[in-house]
Amino acid sequence: EVKDTSYVPIASKPYKTANGKKIDLNKVANSENFPPLSQWSLSKSFPKQASVSKALKNIKSPIWLNDLRNYHNRGNSTFQGESIQLGDFFGLDDVMTESPIVTAGFIKVFSDWITNTGIDGFRIDTARHVNEGFWREFLPAMRKVAKEQGKSYFPMWGEVYDAEPMSTAYWVRQAEYTEVLDFAFQSRVVSFINQRKAELLGELFNDDDLYISDKTNADNLGTFLGNHDMGRIGAFISPISVGPDDLKKDQLAHAILLSLRGVPSVYYGDEFGLTGGEDKEARQDLFPTKVSKWQTQHRIGSDPIGTASSFDIKNPLMDTIKSLNELRVKTPALTRGAQRTFFAKDGVLAIGRYDLETNSRYLMAFNSNSGTKNISFNLDLADAQWQNKSGSATISQKQNLVTIDIPAYSWGIFEMKTDLVKNKSSSAAAKIVLDEPKLNIDRRDQFILSAQVTNVDFAAVDFQIKDGENWRSVGVDKGATFSTDATSNNRYRVFPFLTDVNWNLSPTYRVVATLYDNSTITSQSVSLDKLKP
């Protein structure tokens, strides 16, 4: 307990040993140089004098949580600067995750959950409020334990509450998270549904390239429409009352969620059309409730629940979500396929998905307008045949031009029925065109490699660097960019870090592209010397 909970910056009061020696937390964090607990004094080492009553002195388990020297003791976070990781979270005492004792303790706690319960993954709260060094030890340890339990893939979605892909990509590539929650996806889908901002979704999927490395990509980002903190998709669509088109809008949002890249999650109760608000207002009971405002709260797709159980009520949203989920589960192109944008304008989004292993290809289009929209764009394959698998949109193709008619607040998901490999073999040969490598002006510690693969809509493009004896991959991009600017459209890209390259060995790069028939084409190699720091 501390009376004054205001945050005290390190610059004002640095950590010190019991003998008064300053401790640079950044230098010793999660390392063998971290001062042992015996060198920390509760009265001399911390800016705040924490205390606990005698009755509660040993109440926590594991026992290391009872030692107040295992906490940051700096006061409440201001959610700015260093306090993001060192401050207490709205009064919740912030453990010192830089300490080997704390790191080992949490590894033990979470490992026990895996070994004792057999769980298949974690959703980890407040990930960005913990220092990166902790995650670099903790996350590999969890994967090791899971693998020992026979789990070859053990997802751990970190909650990085930030809607900017550059921020979330940082935690994927530099903090050992291979999965984070995709808050950027959530915000762009809401903007598309409510404000017809298709361009934002097009830009979002271009930014998937930021996640790519030799070990990571955007495939397993956790996608969602709302949650227990921000509120439900129903609340974003119908904050006050239900409009005549709100059911269609809600169904459209779920069609986007369940057909595009990422690992989707449906927030409980959305299938019953719940609305509400933020935080506790988004945590309604589905069983009969005595909370009067929940009894009378408007719902999308059905009437207010009254004293009935949600499980006894029919709602069209449940049927929509169920059918879309069934389609996704049985369709590899939707669960794991590459993705690229073909159209993103005026409240209409058109996306292609492709699975190399099964050579299956899908097109989908979404319309957030109050009237029917007609769009057209070109594909690499002429006169393909398509079959509608979901939604009320219709499609036709003449030569290379695809035309899709999409009713208001609706969608269409179409499967290509043409033999892709057979028909593509008669088309113009694919070629690789490399762009000049350049520094990333948004992050000076990165550079950009980009290339076009002409005459094909989809390719798995492996960017390789040679800064020694052998070529090595720095990432595979499977979805070309979309832009109305020809200089940035149809690009495959990766964003390596400057520190990833041995600049003393005259590094070069090349591209190896895998095509529909699993054949490959390779570019010439290009020097990277001009980027040498």
Locations of regions flagged by a protein language model:
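Active-site-proximal helices and loops of the catalytic beta/alpha 8
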Residues: 3-44, 48, 108-217, 221, ...
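Extracellular interdomain linker/stem segments of modular secreted and single-pass surface proteins
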Residues: 529-533
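Hydrophobic/tyrosine-rich beta-strand signature of extracellular beta-sandwich/beta-rich modules
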Residues: 511-513
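Carbohydrate-interacting/catalytic domains
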Residues: 172, 259-266, 272-448, 454-457, ...
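Active-site clefts of carbohydrate-active enzymes
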Residues: 217-243
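Solvent-exposed loop/turn segments flanking beta-strands in beta-repeat/beta-sandwich domains
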Residues: 454-469
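Short loop/turn motifs at secondary-structure junctions
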Residues: 117-118, 224, 262, 457
